[in-house]
Structure formats: C-alpha cells, structure tokens
C-alpha cells in the first residue's frame, strides 16, 4: 500500500518542486540557482528546470527522467532560458559515445560518485545553439 501511495504522491511533488524552481529562475536570473539551472521548453510545450553546462555554442544537460526520449534520433528544437537570456537550439541525446558522456559529466556533474554506473547517471543531451 505504501508503494502505491508513493507512486501517486511523487509526480505531484515533482511538479510542485519544478514549478518553484522555474519561478525562482525566472524571478532571480542572476541568482545561484539560475547559475546552474535553466528552463527548457520542448517542441511539444513541456517545460522543465534542469542543470546545465554551457561551453561556447553547446549547452549540456543530464536528464534523469524519461523525457530524454524526446531527443532520440535526429533530436528536436528547444528553447532555453539561461540567466535571463532566451536561447534557441537543437537538442539530441548522446547514446553511442560513452567516453564523451563521461568527459562531459565530469564537468556537468562533478560531485557524482565515480563508481556510479553510467546508466544511473542519467542521459546526456547536447543542445547546439542557433545563432542570433
């Protein structure tokens, strides 16, 4: 019975926390949370807060939920809000280059234990920014 209750409670709690994080990023774009988290809007309109790492014209994010599947194959266009700046790009999940994933996650998630199996460390999604 406990598991059923937890499964019912968890999505609602996640939605509530995500809404609070999104509001904080929007209202305090120079704050600590906005320095490490962005708001991403998918092509279908879904919106998520997610940690990111920006390097030149690439934005990296590690996705722990199942929504990384939206970026399989040829990927999809996304819109991001990073520290008050609206950016557009094309996002694609990296499934076939474990060395690249480990390299990027070392910078994106430096506190993740090194013994953690790659499949537990989420999926790496790379966004190539569109020029202004």
Question: Where do the protein language model's features map onto the residues?
Answer:
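N-terminal Sec-pathway targeting helices
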Residues: 1-2
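Short, flexible coil/linker segments at or flanking structured domains
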Residues: 26-28, 40, 47, 59, ...
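Short, conserved active-site entrance elements at the starts or edges of catalytic domains
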Residues: 7-46
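Short, structured beta-strand-loop surface elements
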Residues: 66-132
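Short beta-strand segments
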Residues: 31-64, 88-92
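A short linear-motif detector with a strong N-terminal bias
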Residues: 17-20, 31, 39, 57-59, ...
């Amino acid at each position: 019975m406990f598991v059923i209750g937890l499964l019912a409670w968890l999505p609602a709690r996640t939605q509530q926390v995500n809404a609070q994080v999104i509001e904080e990023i929007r209202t305090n774009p120079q704050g600590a949370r906005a320095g490490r988290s962005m708001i991403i809007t998918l092509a279908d309109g879904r919106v998520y807060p997610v940690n990111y790492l920006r390097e030149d014209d690439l934005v990296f994010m590690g996705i722990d939920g199942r929504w990384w599947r939206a970026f399989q194959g040829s990927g999809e266009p996304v819109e991001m809000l990073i520290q008050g700046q609206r950016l557009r790009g094309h996002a694609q999940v990296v499934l076939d280059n474990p060395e690249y994933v480990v390299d990027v996650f070392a910078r994106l998630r430096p506190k993740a234990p090194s013994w953690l199996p790659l499949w537990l460390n989420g999926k790496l999604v790379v966004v190539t920014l569109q020029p202004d």
